[in-house]
Amino acid sequence: MPSSSERQRALAEFVVRLRRGLADSLVDVRLFGSEARGEASPESDIDVLIVVQPDDARIALEDRIIDIAFDVNVEFGVYISPRVVTPGILNHPVWGATPFLSNVRRESLPL
């Protein structure tokens, strides 16, 4: 099982690869869940919210993000769990107000 420092290195590498691979499409990257709250165990997944643009490219960008997460997961022995949204989803009166996104807004940390 990866140590806390290995998990942090994996997360940092994931963010570097996102920035390199998505460039101008990447709007924001935020850590949430047990890792952000300081409650993670070595078996916990690492929840990451990734905001991309444009809205109509989300599916294609999500595929790339999943590939990046997979590579980092295999290399570091962690489980990064990406959740991909767009500004349109975040600002939508219904989708943006879901309990999930409300919790992410409240507890997330910028990466």
Model-derived regions, located:
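Basic/aromatic recognition patch in beta-strand/loop cores that engages polyanionic ligands
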Residues: 34
